[in-house]
Amino acid sequence: MNIDKALVLRTCANNMADHCGLIWPASGTVESKYWQSTRRHENGLVGLLWGAGTSAFLSVHADARWKVCEVAVADIIGLEEPGMVKFPRAEVVHVGDRISASHFISARQADPASTPTPTPTPMATPTPAAANIALPVVEQPSHEVFDVALVSAAAPSVNTLPVTTPQNLQTATYGSTLSGDNNSRLIAGYGSNETAGNHSDLIAGYGSTGTAGSDSSLVAGYGSTQTAGGDSALTAGYGSTQTAREGSNLTAGYGSTGTAGSDSSLIAGYGSTQTSGEDSSLTAGYGSTQTAQEGSNLTAGYGSTGTAGSDSSLIAGYGSTQTSGGDSSLTAGYGSTQTAQEGSNLTSGYGSTGTAGADSSLIAGYGSTQTSGSDSALTAGYGSTQTAQEGSNLTAGYGSTGTAGSDSSLIAGYGSTQTSGSDSSLTAGYGSTQTAQEGSNLTAGYGSTGTAGVDSSLIAGYGSTQTSGSDSALTAGYGSTQTAQEGSNLTAGYGSTGTAGADSSLIAGYGSTQTSGSESSLTAGYGSTQTAREGSTLTAGYGSTGTAGADSSLIAGYGSTQTSGSDSSLTAGYGSTQTAQQGSVLTSGYGSTQTAGAASNLTTGYGSTGTAGHESFIIAGYGSTQTAGHKSILTAGYGSTQTARDGSDLVAGYGSTGTAGSGSSLIAGYGSTQTASYKSMLTAGYGSTQTAREHSDLVAGYGSTSTAGSNSSLIAGYGSTQTAGFKSIMTAGYGSTQTAQERSDLVAGYGSTSTAGYSSSLIAGYGSTQTAGYGSTLTTGYGSTQTAQENSSLTTGYGSTSTAGYSSSLIAGYGSTQTAGYESTLTAGYGSTQTAQERSDLVTGYGSTSTAGYASSLIAGYGSTQTAGYESTLTAGYGSTQTAQENSSLTTGYGSTSTAGFASSLIAGYGSTQTAGYKSTLTAGYGSTQTAEYGSSLTAGYGSTATAGQDSSLIAGYGSTLTSGIRSFLTAGYGSTLIAGLRSVLIAGYGSSLTSGIRSTLTAGYGSNQIASYGSSLIAGHESIQVAGNKSMLIAGKGSSQTAGFRSTLIAGAGSVQLAGDRSRLIAGADSNQTAGDRSKLLAGNNSYLTAGDRSKLTGGHDCTLMAGDQSRLTAGKNSILTAGARSKLIGSEGSTLSAGEDSTLIFRLWDGKRYRQLVARTGENGVEADIPYYVNEDDDIVDKPDEDDDWIEVE
């Protein structure tokens, strides 16, 4: 070795990298790229001069690579640490382990020739080593002192390497205690204690304590305590405490505490505390605390706390707290708290709190709070709160609150609050509140409030409030309020209020109010009010008020008021008032007033007043007043007054007054007043008043009023009024009025009025009025009025008015008015008016008016007016007016007006007007007017006007006017006018006028006028006029006139006039006139006139006139006149005249009988004079035209 060289010792990782990342070579030169001549460690290479000095900068890892470098003495700078030097470059001369490197340096120190005597540099502080002199030792080192001499003394001589290996290696400073078994290596600072088994490697700073089993590796900073079983690896910073059983791997920062079972892996930042069972893996940031049983995997950010049972997996952000039982998986963002029993899976965003029982799954956004029992699944958006018992499933949007018992399912939108017992299912829109006991099912729209007892089902629209006891079912529209006790069923329209006792059923239209006791059933139309005690049944039309005691039954038409005690049955028409004590039965027509004692039965017509004691039976016509004692039976016609004691039977004609004791029989003539008891027989002349109970036989003369009980037989003369009970048979003369209960048979003369109960058969003469119950058959003469309930069959003469219930069949003569219920069949004569509910079939004569409900079929004569509901089929004669909802099919005669809804099909005769909804198909005769929404198909005759929405297809006859939306297809006959939106296709006959949007295709016959936006394609017949926007393509027949924007293409026949903008292409036949802008191309036949701007190309036949701007090219046949600007090229044949601006070329093509030859002249400097007309004379010379001939050109 050269005496100007010194040896330096240093260590690297097993990949030859130092702590700065520099990769050292196995041999050869290494140099610092950022060298600075300072006494600092950075910006240079450092090491121990001759391998002696502080060990603070030597690697303690067992796999470290020890390198010996040869450094020039002149490059060495001494550092403050004992033995440490800095140098800019070095040559690596040896790489091995600690022992081989020590041997290498010791051998070189023993060689006098290789020992340098370096001259100190100005900045160097250490004393240079002399030959064969030991390196100086620091008296009070702050770190362990490393000396290659000590290492070499403990190892065999270099000449015997590697024959023998040391049994153990121990290096320590004063005050340390080292104890190692075979093949152990122990290194410790002063005041340390190290104890190791076989094949162990312990390295610790001063004041540390290390205890390891066999085959272990312990590395710790000063003041640390490490205890490890066999096959363990512990690494800790200063002041740390690590305890591990066999096969564990612990890594911790300074001040940490780690305790691990066998085969565990712990990694923690400084100040952390980790405790784990066997087969566990813990990773934590600084200041964290982790505790896990065997087989667990914990990962947490700094400042976190994690506690896990066996076989669990915990992942958390910084500052989080996680606690789980065995077989659990927890994942949380920073600042979260999660607590779970065994087998649970929790995932939450930052700042969340999750608490779960065994086998549960929790997922939550940031800032959420979740608490669940075992076997539960909770999912929530950010800022939500969920609490559930075992076996529950909760899903909520952000900011929601959910509380559920066991085995429940909750789904809610954002900002909702849900609380349920076990086995419940709750679904709510955003901002809703739901509270349910166990076994309930709640569904609500947004902003709703639902409260349910056990085993209940609630469904509500948005903004509703529902409260129910157990075993209840509530259904409500939006904005409704429902309150029910257990076992109730409530259904209400929007804005309704329902309150029900236990086991009740409530049904109401919108805006209704219902209150019922237990076991009640209430049904009401919209805007009604019903109040009932337990066990009652109430049915009312819209706007009614019903109040019932227990076990009562109330039925009322719209606008009625009913009040009853318990066990009562009340039936009333619209606008009636009924008051009854317990056990009563009341029946009245519309506008009636009834008051009954207990157990009474009252039946009255409309506008009547009935007062009865208990267990009485009263029947009266409209406008009557009846007062009966106990168990009395009163029957009176309309407008009568009857007073009877109990058990009496009274029968009186109309306008009569009857008062009878019990069990009496009364018979009276017309205008009479009779009062009789039950089972009485009353006979009265006409104009009499009779009142009788059921099973009575009444006979009355003309103008009589008869009122009979059930199953009575009544016979009356002209102008009589009869009122009969159930299953009665009534016969009356002309102008009679008959009233009967259900299943009665009524026969009346002309001008009669008949009122019958259920399933009655009524026959009346001309001008009669009949009213029948359900399933009745009515027959009347001319001008009659019939009213029947559902399933009735009505037959009337001319000018009659018929009103029927559901599924009725009506037949009427001319000028009749018919009104029928659902699924009715109506037939009427000329000039009739028919009104039917949905799915009705109407047939009318000429000039009729028909109005039908949903899915009806209407047929009408000439001049009729028909109005139909949805999906109707209408057929009308000439001049009719039809109005239908969507999906209707309309057929009308000439001059009709049809208006149809969505997707309708309309067919009309000549001169008709049709208006249809979306996607309609319209067909009309000549001169018709059609209007349809987009997507429609219209077909019209000659001279028609059609207006359609976009995507429509229109076909019209001659002289028609069509207007359509975009993307339409229009076809028209001769002389038509078509207007369409952009992207339309128009086809028209001769002489038509077409106007379209951009990018349209127009096709027209001869002499047509077309106007289109730019980019359109136009095709027209001869002598047409076309006007198009820019970039259009125009094709026309001979004699046509075409006008287009720039960059357009125009094609026309002979005798045409073409005008186009710049960069256009014009093609025309002979005798045409073409005008275009700059950079255009023009082509025309003989005797044509062509004009274009600069840089254009013009080509014409014989006898043509061509004029163009600068830099143009003109070509023409014989006897033509060509004029162009500067820098142009002109080509003409025999007899042509050419004139051009400066720097142009004039070419004359001449035929000599065998071939063509050319005469060329150039204008400008060195050429002929510019802007002078030239021609070829008889001598084949190019000469200019004389001035006197300048005006020879004849321009058309």
Swiss-Prot record:
Its main location: membrane. Keywords: Cell outer membrane, Ice nucleation, Membrane, Repeat. It is found in: Cell outer membrane. Residues 172-1147 are annotated as: Octapeptide periodicity. The keyword Cytoplasm does not apply. Residues 269-304, 319-352, 415-442 are annotated as: Disordered. It is a peripheral membrane protein. GO terms for cellular component: cell outer membrane. The keyword Membrane applies. InterPro entries: Ice_nucleatn. Membrane environment or aggregation seems to be required for ice nucleation activity. PANTHER family: KERATIN-ASSOCIATED PROTEIN 21-1-RELATED, PTHR31294. Ice nucleation proteins enable bacteria to nucleate crystallization in supercooled water. This is Ice nucleation protein. The lineage of its organism: Bacteria, Pseudomonadati, Pseudomonadota, Gammaproteobacteria, Pseudomonadales.
